[in-house]
Design a protein with these regions (language model features):
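All-alpha prenyltransferase/terpene-synthase fold signal
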Residues: 1-324
Length: 324
């Protein structure tokens, strides 16, 4: 069994040595740039860990794992363009370093490359892999569309939000694990349980992201705290604050959400205080713990010896141990 750290090293080395020998270079340069920015490489790591539950040669599916990482970074490239973001992982975003049209075209090419790389598997698995990958890619687009529509809605329900983050975030983690299982000839039942494990850990991971944006340490979290509050992003926190607030709290919350001219720190402090009064802090922690607990049940159901699952368990715990 490989450790997650060994797998991460394999993934990074493989990505670094992928060749782009097509022309024009100006189309492929932004792709190399995006994939060289680093990142946690969670999705390829999960795929290889799932494969390694059954087979001892995870290096055999590095191309498929890196296909998923290529796809994930394609979505980030286009997300940055839609959000008009300046920076990603401490680097200029593609549309800022080059231009909007280059970001669109290089992003589109990344999507095609992701499919080309994913297709490099044996024929018996090809249809199952591409069917799952295609449905997942469609679901992620659906999740992104819901997320954009929520920006202009003030009646978003908790269950709608959970479904949105399932589509936008969870299904790609789930897909990574299931593809790893399929390529390793796991049983259909094991592959499905690994998918559900990924789905639940993805929900916990995204809800924790919401939580850390309010209660995290910016030095550890890696970005400025309170960004979701200042942009009025419909998160688990804000949705439940509106749902559970009394009249006075709701009125103050509405005033801050409606404000066009405000002091950033004052707004973050005021909304955080309201969250504390309403009990959103504990509510969010309980929900994160619930989904993390559910994920463990699905991993428990995977029919391989416990010692083989240990590395995947440790990796899931590490995903959830970002500092508050």
């Amino acid at each position: 069994m490989k450790t997650a750290d060994e797998i991460l090293k394999m993934v990074n080395e493989f990505l670094d040595h992928l060749s782009y020998d097509r022309k024009p270079e100006s189309l492929y340069e932004p792709i190399k740039y995006v994939l060289s920015m680093g990142g946690k490489r969670i999705r390829p790591t999960l795929m290889l860990l799932a494969y390694n539950l059954y087979k001892e040669n995870p290096e055999d599916i590095l191309m498929n794992a890196c296909a998923l990482e290529t796809y994930h970074n394609y979505t980030l490239l286009h997300d940055d363009l839609m959000d008009n973001a300046d920076m990603r992982r401490g680097h200029l975003t593609v549309h800022k370093k080059w231009n909007d049209n280059t970001a669109i075209l290089s992003g589109d090419s990344m999507l095609v490359l992701a499919y080309q790389r994913m297709m490099q598997c044996d024929a018996k698995h090809l249809k199952d892999i591409l069917d799952l990958f295609t449905v997942t890619a469609l679901e992620i687009g659906e999740g992104q569309q819901y997320d954009m529509e929520f920006e202009t809605r003030n009646d978003v329900k908790e269950e709608e939000y959970i479904e949105m983050i399932r589509l936008k975030t969870s299904v790609l983690l789930a897909c990574a694990l299931k593809i790893g299982a399929i390529l390793a000839d796991a049983s259909a039942e094991d592959a499905d349980n690994l998918y559900k494990f990924g789905e639940q850990i993805g929900l916990a991971f995204q809800l924790q992201d919401d939580y850390l944006d309010v209660y995290g340490d910016s030095k550890v979290f890696g970005k400025e705290i309170g960004g979701d509050i200042t942009s009025n992003k419909k998160t688990y926190m804000l949705i439940n604050a509106f749902n559970k607030a009394n009249d006075a709290q709701r009125e103050e919350l509405t005033r801050w959400v409606s404000a066009r001219d405000f002091d950033r720190n004052e707004k973050v402090d005021a909304v955080t205080r309201l969250y504390n009064e309403i009990g959103i802090d504990q509510l969010a922690q309980d929900k994160i713990a619930y989904y993390f607990g559910q994920s463990k049940k699905f991993l428990d159901a995977v029919n391989v010896p416990e010692e083989k699952k240990e590395e995947l368990r440790k990796y899931a715990q590490k995903m959830m141990k970002r500092q508050y």
